[in-house]
């Protein structure tokens, strides 16, 4: 879609929604609307139902974590209008305690997307019919896509041959320190390493 057409769409949406749009950005051939949490459902409903918009397909909901911000999460909704051949992105900001209204009443397919955002980031959705984890295991601690989640996780899940079942154990780093040999003859060095049978001798 052309920049001009996206600019016209942005102007039309801002005219219809007024203060419900905090910011509209047009960059790289994509339109992004930033809206307050309280206006989210109204904005999504208008984008779906308005004849000029017809964004009837919710293709994704994702989270983005900015731990240095007061409202650390962006919740990003990707919408598609097959009739208009247009895509649009809607963003809201939330902190760990903010309840984002569930988009399930507007787009039924939002149910699993919101469960994934909850599971991976801990983003809370009010009015969701079944807000529970969807990807991680039962009893999983934390939310693995948050920037402050440890790379190793909190527990190690593995199959124990002796017990014939899956076991959960505290993470143990098998190799706390590793001494790398940076003086390798394969790196084009001119010196001979002790014990290197292939080293050149003068």
UniProtKB/Swiss-Prot annotation:
- Indicate the enzyme's highest-level EC class: translocase
Name this protein carries in UniProt: NADH-quinone oxidoreductase subunit C
Instruction: List, alphabetically, the SUPFAM superfamilies matched.
Output: Nqo5-like (SSF143243)
Gene Ontology CC terms: plasma membrane
Catalytic activity, as annotated: a quinone + NADH + 5 H(+)(in) = a quinol + NAD(+) + 4 H(+)(out)
This protein's assembly is summarised as: NDH-1 is composed of 14 different subunits. Subunits NuoB, C, D, E, F, and G constitute the peripheral sector of the complex.
Where in or outside the cell it occurs: the entry states: Cell inner membrane
**E.C. number:** 7.1.1.-
Q: What does this protein do?
A: NDH-1 shuttles electrons from NADH, via FMN and iron-sulfur (Fe-S) centers, to quinones in the respiratory chain. The immediate electron acceptor for the enzyme in this species is believed to be ubiquinone. Couples the redox reaction to proton translocation (for every two electrons transferred, four hydrogen ions are translocated across the cytoplasmic membrane), and thus conserves the redox energy in a proton gradient.
InterPro entries documented for this protein: NADH_DH_suC, NADH_quin_OxRdtase_su_C/D-like, NADH_UbQ_OxRdtase_30kDa_su, NADH_UbQ_OxRdtase_CS
Q: State any single GO MF term.
A: NADH dehydrogenase (ubiquinone) activity
Chief site of localization: membrane
Which cysteines share a disulfide bond? none
Q: Which family does it belong to?
A: Belongs to the complex I 30 kDa subunit family.
Taxonomically, the superkingdom here is Bacteria
The alphabetized UniProt keywords are: Cell inner membrane, Cell membrane, Membrane, NAD, Quinone, Translocase, Transport, Ubiquinone
UniProt membrane topology term: Peripheral membrane protein
Q: Which residues form a coiled coil?
A: none
């Amino acid at each position: 879609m052309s920049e001009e057409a996206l600019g016209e769409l942005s102007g039309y949406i801002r005219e219809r929604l007024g203060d419900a749009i905090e910011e509209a950005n047009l960059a790289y051939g994509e339109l992004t609307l930033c809206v307050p949490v309280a206006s989210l459902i109204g904005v999504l409903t208008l984008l779906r139902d308005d004849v000029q918009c017809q964004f009837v397909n919710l293709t994704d909901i994702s989270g983005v974590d900015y731990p240095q911000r007061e409202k650390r999460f962006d919740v990003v909704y990707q919408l598609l209008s097959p009739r208009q051949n247009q895509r649009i992105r809607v963003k809201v900001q939330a902190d760990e305690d903010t309840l984002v209204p569930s988009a399930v009443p507007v787009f039924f397919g939002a149910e699993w997307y919101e469960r994934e955002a909850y599971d991976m980031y801990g983003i809370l959705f009010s009015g969701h019919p079944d807000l529970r984890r969807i990807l991680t295991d039962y009893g999983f601690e934390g939310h693995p896509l948050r920037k402050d989640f440890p790379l190793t996780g909190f527990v190690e899940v593995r199959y124990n041959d002796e017990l014939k079942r899956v076991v959960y154990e505290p993470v143990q780093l098998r190799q706390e320190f590793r001494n790398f040999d940076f003086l390798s003859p394969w790196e084009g060095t001119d010196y001979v390493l002790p014990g290197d049978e292939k080293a050149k001798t003068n």
